[in-house]
């Protein structure tokens, strides 16, 4: 018995260090530790294959793997699974065939479990919600971005936010000036790492974000965050990089956000901003905004989510945005 307890304790310690279990008390991992089995794989080994039935999941302790998804258009999208990550959970959550092929890049160790272990893991406090969020983020990476052509001919892309956008925004070459950040966050201080993490870690249901990119760099984003007391209301916010301001991106994004909101059951948009944020006020005024003063220099408003007929978007663009929004919002039930 002592040997079994010691083995389980070692597994609990290893599991507790993984991202998916961050913040979970060790005692909550005991049942899971008893239901998973050790995994060791050589470089180049296929662990999961796209299209196959889902019967297990993997937790990576060391090493890395390539995650490859081939879309209906035949284009392969490649990602990487690193230590601390879980793979194989999407198909189990959706009760569907595998959505990607996972191949080890180097020798890999970890843990594997079946449906029983997965059920145990989902019921660990906080883990189920984290798995749903992670699954939606991964599925969002498989969505093809929507080409967007601005009035001046600039070609950009629209897509849902992805986890790596925080690093791409912070370390990219696109500049967001102090004035732009002040208007967005209503503070002269640079956004903290914790806030930047929150802004990029979304679930696409209660917190949805569109990102506009130029190449691989995010140049603008628009988000809605659902009200905790009234799920039909969501607060919206926009950020556009300095070099891209005044080119119609904000007007386009409120249209894209409105389409996604209607898919998600949001009926009204709330906005809170600095009173001198004229570009955003102008956009909101087009949809009947009535402003209230909340504090010195801060105003608020509430508008109905604009319908397709009110948006400055073509029918084809609305349909594309609707399809992509539905893909990520309804990705995991």
Curated annotation (Swiss-Prot):
What broad class of enzyme is this? transferase
Q: Name the Gene Ontology molecular function terms of this record.
A: acetyltransferase activity; acyltransferase activity; cAMP binding; DNA-binding transcription factor activity; metal ion binding
Example of a GO cellular component annotation carried by this entry: cytosol
Activity regulation details: Autoinhibited and allosterically activated by 3,5-cyclic adenosine monophosphate (cAMP). An extensive conformational rearrangement relieves this autoinhibition by means of a substrate-mimicking lid that covers the protein-substrate binding surface.
Query: Which sites bind Mg(2+)?
Result: 214
Keywords of this entry: Acyltransferase, Magnesium, Metal-binding, Transferase
Q: What is the effect of changing residue 173 to K?
A: Induces autoacetylation of the new lysine in the absence of cAMP
Q: Give the consequence of mutating residue 184 to A.
A: Completely abolishes the interaction with the aliphatic tail of the substrate lysine
SUPFAM superfamilies hit by this protein = Acyl-CoA N-acyltransferases (Nat), cAMP-binding domain-like
- What Enzyme Commission number does this protein have? 2.3.1.-
Give the source's domain of life in one word.
Bacteria
Q: In the UniProt annotation, what is the result of changing residue 185 to A?
A: Completely abolishes the interaction with the aliphatic tail of the substrate lysine
Q: Which cofactor does it need?
A: Mg(2+)
Q: What is the effect of changing residue 223 to A?
A: Substantially decreases the interaction with the aliphatic tail of the substrate lysine. Markedly reduced activity, with an altered pH-rate profile and abolishes direct interactions with R-184
Q: Supply the PANTHER family for this chain.
A: CRP FAMILY TRANSCRIPTIONAL REGULATORY PROTEIN (PTHR24567), HTH-TYPE TRANSCRIPTIONAL REGULATOR ARCR (PTHR24567:SF74)
Describe the task this protein carries out: Catalyzes specifically the acetylation of the epsilon-amino group of a highly conserved lysine residue in acetyl-CoA synthetase (ACS). This acetylation results in the inactivation of ACS activity and could be important for mycobacteria to adjust to environmental changes.
Query: How does this protein assemble?
Result: Homodimer.
The protein here is known as Acetyltransferase Pat
Give the organism the record lists: Mycobacterium tuberculosis (strain ATCC 25618 / H37Rv)
